[in-house]
Amino acid sequence: MFTILLDNGHGVNTSGKCSPKKADGTRFREYKFARTIVTNIATKLKALGYNVIIVTPEQEDISLGERVRRINKSVRQYGAGNCLMISVHANAAGNNDKWMSARGWSAWTTRG
C-alpha cells in the first residue's frame, strides 16, 4: 500500500513563525495554518484509499532529528518506493510588526 507521510511545520511553542499583527491585533500563525492544511490533505487522501501518517500530531514543536527518525521508521516499514513525505510550511516573512521582502514558494525533494 502506498503511504503518504505528512509533516506540519513548526509547533505552537516555536518562536517567530507568524505574520505581523493585523489591524484587529491578531497574527497569522504558521503552526495553525500547517495543521489545518495537513488535516484537510489527510482526510482527502484517506478517502482516496491512501495510507496516511501524520508525522507530527503534537501541538508542540518536534525536533528535526525526531521528525527524521519517525519518517525513517515508516520508510523501513512500508518501503522507500512506497512512501512520499510532504512537509507543509507557510514560510511567513514577518519581522515583529513589518513584512520582509521574501516572495514565492519552494519545493524540496531527494533523488529517486
Model-derived regions: residue spans:
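Mature extracellular/periplasmic domains of secretome proteins
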Residues: L64-A80, A102, T109
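Polar, enzyme-active/binding microenvironments
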Residues: K44-A47, H89, T110-G112
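A general structural motif
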Residues: M1, A80-N82
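Active-site histidine-acidic residue metal-binding/catalytic motifs
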Residues: M1-V68, S101-R103
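Short glycine-rich anion-binding loops that position phosphate/pyrophosphate groups of nucleotides
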Residues: H10-V12, A90-A93
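Active-site-adjacent substrate-recognition loops and nearby beta-strands
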Residues: G94-R111
